[in-house]
Amino acid sequence: MYGYVDKNGDGWRELPDGSPLVLMSATQPDQRNRQLNELLRKHMNAIGLNIVFKPAKWPENLKAARAGKLQMWGVASTAAGGDGQSILERYYGPSAGQGNLARFKLPAFDALFEKLTGLADGPEREAVFRDAKRLAVAYMPYKLHCHRFVVDMMYGDVVGYRRPAYWLDWWHMIDVAPQPAGRA
């Protein structure tokens, strides 16, 4: 596809000029990431793509990503608001090297994002969201492929716990009920 084919018969695709095509993916040296890497390697190899994983500690990978030194890196995210504007900032050109780790720059998207920040909730804002999301999907600087689910278990004496819809900070809203006398 587009000249990225196996030209020398070694089983791996090459760049259109015939030089080796090797994907370099940053990762962390832990069991969960090793399992995800093996799954990704299996699927990349199935389509003839050679992928090499470079493990480093998470802060080192973040520093390299902000400096624009990584080709690929898998990171997770958590919703921060009801409408997803904070997630769309990852595609905003002026945020390159901060929230926009892919350093994606597209003037059409940037204009939509800037318009979005000044609009109140309503049909016009929703239409701008739709257009921005379409550009993000079409250019795909981020490949979203995993949705994590969280299951909560709670001790009976915990009072006031309710998982927030956004963010992960719930600990300041709980208390432990005093135990009745005679209960150990």
Annotate each predicted stretch with a short phrase.
Residues 7-13, 53-55, 124, 128:
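Surface-exposed patches in mature extracellular/periplasmic domains of secreted proteins
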Residues 19-29, 51-54, 71-72:
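Short, well-ordered beta-strand elements
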Residues 31-42, 61-184:
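Detector for C-terminal structural segments
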